[in-house]
């Protein structure tokens, strides 16, 4: 904090936050129990149970976690105010591989490098050596050994350095080599950090997962026994993303990169190498050798013309389980070795290493094609990290294949370079396989010709061609080949694949859709694993899950679509693993339940955790009900969570189990679960699936709503430890205070798009909050001087209506969980309404309205900034905590009155702009440019009716609007009709711009812009606020007249809601005003005296030049008894009144503009005042 200037405001907020948190803890405000609520009859307005996916305990919580959980926190804050009994529990997740992997890594580092470890120096050259051939390496001069050490905090490969960056000592770090220490260290820190932001959590219900917590362990075992009993869990070989290094499946949470990536299925087409073999393969004579190509389009294999390899790519030949030799890349062979292709799992028996160029020209037999022999040809764009490195060529349907084949046909030099004979290329033409309506039976040829693709180097055009063809081909394409003629591709694809596999021409091959790296830095493969899996593909289960989703609130259509897509493709999910932390499978204890599977219905455990664990995170303390973990058998859990389950055989007294049951029945289902959108395809979908499986007949226990949010950017950039653009929760609270941070989180964003936490906005928010508290204190101090009596002035009524409208809008925004909008309507716009009232209420603000505003504002802001609001609630002398307050009741809203006030503000803004333009120098020669004299008077003209041409236009538009169900026709139709009306002939240049303006206003304000009269009295609104308008424009006088009294030009331009004005400067005679008071800060000045001036108008004019005068009642004007000689005499100190007469408030000034003389009339007497007067300020 030392680096930041001026922390007084943040320190003030932190101080009141501590006080509020101590108060809530002492009063146990957030601790709720079903039995107590039901006894007190506090559940009449319903309950609200909200949960957040428990964060993983391998580090401190950061701002991203906080943003997601703030959605729960704000929702609970709002629902409390609406009178609901609210429960927000918070657990901490320790299941899975990362903690164990980090602990083991630390252990290895200590074994290898000592304690504390002495790591080998890393030279820059090492960094560069990882660059790929052909990459340009830019040397960063700033990077040497020293900067590496500094950078270790964010991106070190050593676990020791990562722990060091958390501020831990060497002695502390050693303890983390035991996984259990992580469970003791990080969970209490998480609770501590969360408490500093004033989370409305019942901390008695918090727990950590894994078998360290015997109650939770028992709960998860019960869940899995139930799922197995209901046939949801099965055993067998499944295709799974797998880490060979870890020796087990690699689930989403265990991945360094590739979260959400699943296995991609290919058809592995076997292209038999014909004898004579290329010289490189001659040693394998007598063996069946196949080039194996991975394709997503088995239905196009009828059109193969050749096979592609990349000349400069490394390939291997390896022996399969049946003795055949497959040629592909090492990477693909590694995947195949885990899918039963080789004799021994994970072992690739390499029999030959070769470069692609060494098999160019080899002759092949390809299945299904009409060509008996095809050849191996060069393609330079094959990627090593996708497929097998061998690509089968179908130029009729693949733009890439066609472009490469045409290159070879056109370029003799290219064929010569790679030793390709003409007969290997020239006779081969694209073969029609399928027809796409509108494109033809050689789709790739048609599209490549249309886009004028010249060669395989036209990458962008080729990408465009593929995009055009592939989806159209799959959905609209029709087969042309015998046996499948006329059938749609999407219907025959699987059949053709099966036929090829049955004929021994192909196999199923899987690899990850994209690269997946495990947290142990191992590139994952797809493996066929023996494992226990949840059968999410089960048709009935899926159907019921879709039913749950149908009734579930997702708050936005995009989230719903993401859920639908996820539920659609979810099949089997491996729920067991052999490494990490967690609960053992109850019927097969060699397996652990993985972290995405023990976290699907734990919300039910929250309902009873406080009665079992007694507030201890690890579940090691004595249970408040005296229940031991081993007593929680499957039958006991059944009784607690299943309504119709019989009472079990147990030593636990029935009333105690009934207490657990009561808690569950009261709080379930979960009313809201909020989370990042990246959890929709996994955790949140499993959450729905498992609730449906556990309570299949009780849809009233299924999730009610799920709110997904985007990721959080920090200052418009991705949060990243390595770049330093990162804030932990504790750092954010330290920097901005809890409420300052919460305000910025509410303002960061509402949708599933990425939100943005802007530090400058957080700082501005702190200032707003501080200013708000100071203003409340100011109002409390000046309470007695505020206006009382009826609150019925124009601005009183507007302010009351705007408050009521603000309450209603903010209520709607909170209800829809649109928190950025709720902050806008319930704080920013609410404060703006108060500021406007303060500015417009020239007669002073009304006490009742000011204090209603303070109360309402405090409540509306409470979900976002509870500490500050608690402080203000106390300042207001309220006996209870604001946590027991109720949502304010909105009174009537006079929309017409609010619009009349908006009209007033628009007129004031318009007048200021026109005054500015009036004061601009007249256009002309540069030497002539003199600013205009400031006007003193203004006449505002308002129209009762529209000019005739506008009246006719509006009437016409209104008739179209009513005839076309609230829509206006195109401008062409309108112009044609209006142009035919004789009354509008001479106005046609103005008519269509007027129509365009009306259409634009209609989008903003609705159909009322077609009305011929305003809903309020324009003149009355302006007259009631004439003092405000006069003061804000610094004019002497404003009069309001009807346009009918003005000249023709004004009458034609002026229309309802759009007044016109005329500025003018009333002539006057300059008079000196002298202040004889010594050291007063007031000086002599010259002002114009105008016909009919009073003392008050002259003093107001004086106040514009002498800004030191704040109160006109403190100023007195005097005239010299001798107007000619008086001003010439030297003033005598202490005799300011000598030879002068006080001018009474009733005096009227008169001017003779010809002789430039001023006199005043007072009580019927006329007196000359000369060219000088005196003013005294008391």
Curated annotation (Swiss-Prot):
What the entry lists under CDD domains is as follows: Anticodon_Ia_Leu_AEc
Q: What is its EC number?
A: 6.1.1.4
Q: Where are the Phosphoserine residues found in this chain? A: 169, 722
User: Subcellular localization, per the record?
Assistant: Cytoplasm
Q: Which residues carry this modification: N6-acetyllysine?
A: 972, 1049
Q: Which stretches of sequence are listed as region Editing domain?
A: 262-511
What are the UniProt keywords, alphabetically? Acetylation, Aminoacyl-tRNA synthetase, ATP-binding, Cytoplasm, Ligase, Nucleotide-binding, Phosphoprotein, Protein biosynthesis
GO CC, alphabetical? aminoacyl-tRNA synthetase multienzyme complex; cytosol; endoplasmic reticulum; lysosome; nuclear body
Q: Which GO terms describe its biological process?
A: cellular response to L-leucine; cellular response to leucine starvation; glutaminyl-tRNA aminoacylation; leucyl-tRNA aminoacylation; positive regulation of TORC1 signaling; regulation of cell size
- Motif ('HIGH' region) on chain: 62-65
Q: Give the motif span ('KMSKS' region).
A: 718-722
- Per UniProt, L-leucine binds at 54, 56, 596, 599
Query: Per its UniProt record, what InterPro entries does this chain match?
Result: aa-tRNA-synth_I_CS (IPR001412), aa-tRNA-synth_Ia (IPR002300), LARS1_ULD (IPR054509), Leu-tRNA-synth_Ia_arc/euk (IPR004493), M/V/L/I-tRNA-synth_anticd-bd (IPR013155), RBD_LARS1 (IPR055416), Rossmann-like_a/b/a_fold (IPR014729), tRNAsynth_Ia_anticodon-bd (IPR009080)
Name the family: Belongs to the class-I aminoacyl-tRNA synthetase family.
Q: Which PANTHER family match?
A: LEUCINE--TRNA LIGASE, CYTOPLASMIC, LEUCYL-TRNA SYNTHETASE
Domain characteristics, as noted in the entry: The structure of cytoplasmic leucine-tRNA ligase includes four main functional domains: the Rossmann-fold aminoacylation domain, the editing domain known as connective peptide 1 (CP1), the anticodon binding domain for tRNA recognition, and the vertebrate C-terminal (VC) domain for tRNA binding.
For this entry, the protein name equals: Leucine--tRNA ligase, cytoplasmic
User: Which organism was this protein described from?
Assistant: Mus musculus (Mouse)
Q: Which gene encodes it?
A: Lars1
């Amino acid at each position: 904090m030392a680096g930041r200037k001026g922390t007084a405001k943040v320190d003030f907020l932190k101080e009141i936050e501590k006080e509020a948190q101590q108060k809530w803890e002492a009063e146990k405000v957030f601790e709720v129990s079903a039995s107590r609520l039901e006894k007190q009859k506090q559940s009449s307005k319903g309950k609200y149970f909200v949960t957040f996916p428990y964060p993983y305990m391998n580090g401190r919580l950061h701002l991203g976690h906080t943003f997601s959980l703030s959605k729960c926190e704000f929702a609970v804050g709002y629902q409390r105010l609406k009178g609901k009994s609210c429960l927000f529990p918070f657990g901490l997740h320790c299941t899975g591989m990362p903690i164990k992997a980090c602990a083991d890594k630390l252990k290895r580092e200590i074994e290898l490098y000592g304690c504390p470890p002495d790591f080998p120096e890393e030279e820059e050259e090492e960094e560069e050596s990882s660059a790929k051939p052909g990459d340009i390496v830019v040397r960063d001069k700033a990077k040497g050994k020293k900067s590496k050490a500094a950078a270790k905090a964010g991106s070190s490969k050593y676990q020791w350095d990562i722990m060091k960056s958390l501020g831990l000592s060497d002695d502390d770090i050693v303890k983390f080599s035991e996984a259990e220490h992580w469970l003791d260290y990080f969970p209490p820190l998480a609770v501590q950090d969360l408490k500093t932001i004033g989370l409305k959590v019942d901390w008695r219900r918090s727990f950590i997962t894994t078998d360290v917590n015997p109650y939770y362990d028992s709960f998860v075992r019960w869940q899995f026994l139930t799922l197995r009993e209901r046939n949801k869990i099965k055993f067998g070989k499944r295709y799974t993303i797998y880490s060979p290094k870890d020796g087990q499946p690699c689930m989403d949470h265990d991945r360094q990169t590739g979260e959400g990536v699943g296995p991609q299925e290919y058809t592995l087409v076997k292209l038999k190498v014909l004898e004579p073999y290329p010289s490189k393969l001659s040693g394998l004579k007598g063996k069946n050798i196949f080039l194996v190509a991975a394709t997503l389009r088995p239905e196009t294999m009828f059109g193969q013309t050749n096979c592609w390899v990349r000349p400069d790519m490394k390939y291997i030949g390896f022996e399969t389980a049946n003795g055949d030799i497959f040629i592909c890349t090492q990477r693909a062979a590694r995947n195949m070795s885990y899918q039963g292709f080789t004799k021994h799992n994970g072992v690739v028996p390499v029999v030959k290493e070769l470069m692609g160029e060494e098999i160019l020209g080899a002759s092949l037999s390809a299945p299904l094609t009409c060509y008996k022999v095809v050849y191996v040809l060069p393609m330079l764009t094959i990627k090593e990290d996708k497929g097998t490195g061998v690509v089968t060529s179908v130029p009729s349907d693949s733009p890439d294949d066609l472009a490469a084949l045409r290159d070879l046909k056109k370029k003799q030099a290219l064929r010569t370079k790679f030793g390709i004979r003409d007969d290997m290329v020239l006779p081969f033409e694209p073969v029609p396989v399928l027809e796409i309506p509108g494109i033809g039976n050689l789709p790739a040829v048609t599209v490549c010709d249309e886009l004028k693709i010249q060669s395989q180097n036209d990458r962008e055009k080729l990408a465009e061609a593929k995009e055009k063809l592939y989806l159209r081909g799959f959905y609209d394409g029709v087969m042309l080949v015998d046996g499948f003629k006329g059938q749609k591709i999407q219907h025959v694809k699987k059949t053709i694949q099966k036929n090829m596999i049955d004929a021994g021409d192909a196999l199923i091959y899987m690899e990850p859709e994209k690269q997946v790296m495990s947290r142990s830095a191992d590139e994952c493969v797809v493996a066929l694993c023996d494992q226990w899996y949840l059968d999410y593909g089960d048709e009935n289960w899926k159907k019921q899950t879709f039913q749950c989703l149908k009734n579930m609130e997702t708050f936005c259509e995009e989230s719903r679509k993401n859920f639908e897509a996820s539920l659609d493709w979810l099949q089997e999910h491996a729920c067991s693993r052999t490494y990490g932390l967690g609960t053992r499978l109850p019927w097969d204890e060699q397996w652990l339940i993985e972290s995405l599977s023990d976290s699907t219905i734990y919300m039910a455990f929250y309902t009873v955790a406080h009665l079992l664990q007694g507030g201890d995170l690890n579940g090691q303390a004595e249970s408040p009900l005296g229940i031991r973990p081993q007593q929680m058998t499957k039958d006991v859990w059944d009784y607690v969570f299943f309504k119709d389950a019989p009472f079990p055989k147990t030593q636990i007294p029935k009333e105690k189990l009934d207490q657990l049951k009561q808690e569950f029945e009261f709080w379930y289902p979960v009313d809201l679960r909020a989370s990042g959108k990246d959890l929709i395809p996994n955790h949140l979908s499993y959450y729905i699936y498992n609730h449906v499986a556990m309570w299949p007949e009780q849809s009233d226990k299924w999730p009610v709503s799920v709110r997904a949010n985007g990721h959080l950017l920090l200052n418009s950039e991705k949060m990243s430890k390595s770049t330093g653009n990162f804030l932990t929760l504790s750092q954010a609270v330290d920097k901005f205070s809890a409420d300052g941070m919460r305000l910025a989180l509410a303002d960061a964003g509402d949708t599933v798009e990425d939100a943005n936490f802007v530090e400058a906005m957080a700082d501005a928010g702190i200032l707003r909050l501080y200013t708000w508290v100071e203003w409340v204190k100011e109002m409390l101090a000046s309470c007695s001087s505020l206006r009382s009596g009826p609150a019925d002035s124009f601005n009183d009524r507007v302010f009351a209506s705007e408050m009521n409208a603000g309450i209603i809008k903010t209520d709607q925004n909170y209800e829809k969980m649109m928190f950025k909008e709720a902050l806008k309507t319930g704080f920013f716009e609410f404060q703006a309404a108060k500021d406007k009232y303060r500015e417009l209420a020239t007669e002073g603000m009304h006490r009742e309205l000011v204090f209603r505003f303070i109360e309402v504002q405090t409540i509306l802001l409470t979900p976002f900034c509870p500490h500050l609001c608690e402080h203000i609630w106390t300042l207001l002398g309220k006996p209870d905590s604001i946590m027991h307050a109720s949502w304010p009741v909105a009174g009537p809203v006079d929309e017409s009155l609010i619009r009349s006030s908006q009209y007033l503000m628009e007129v004031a803004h318009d007048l200021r702009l026109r005054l500015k333009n009036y004061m601009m120098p007249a256009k002309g020669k540069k030497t002539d440019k003199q600013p205009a004299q400031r006007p003193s008077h203004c006449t505002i003209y308002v129209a009762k009716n529209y000019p005739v041409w506008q009246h006719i236009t509006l009437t016409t538009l209104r008739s179209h609007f009513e005839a076309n169900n609230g829509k206006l026709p195109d401008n062409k139709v309108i112009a044609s009709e209006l142009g035919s009306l004789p009354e509008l002939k001479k106005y046609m240049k103005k008519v269509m711009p007027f129509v365009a303006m009306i259409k634009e206003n209609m989008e903003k304000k609705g159909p009322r812009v077609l009305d011929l009269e305003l809903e309020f009295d324009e003149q009355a609104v302006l007259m009631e606020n004439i003092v405000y308008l006069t003061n804000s424009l610094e004019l002497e006088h404003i009069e309001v007249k009807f346009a009918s009294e003005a000249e023709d030009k004004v009458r034609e331009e002026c229309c309802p809601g759009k007044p016109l004005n005329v500025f003018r400067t009333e002539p006057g005679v300059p008079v000196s005003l002298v202040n004889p008071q010594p050291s007063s800060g007031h000086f002599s000045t010259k002002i114009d005296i105008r016909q009919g001036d009073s003392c008050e108008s002259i003093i107001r004019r004086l106040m514009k030049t002498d800004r030191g005068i704040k109160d006109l009642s403190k100023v007195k004007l005097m005239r010299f008894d001798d107007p000619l000689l008086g001003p010439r005499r030297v003033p005598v100190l202490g005799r300011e009144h000598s030879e002068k007469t006080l001018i009474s408030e009733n005096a009227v000034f008169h001017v003779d503009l010809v002789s430039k003389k001023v006199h005043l009339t007072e009580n019927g007497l006329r007196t000359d005042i000369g060219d000088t007067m005196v003013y005294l300020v008391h």
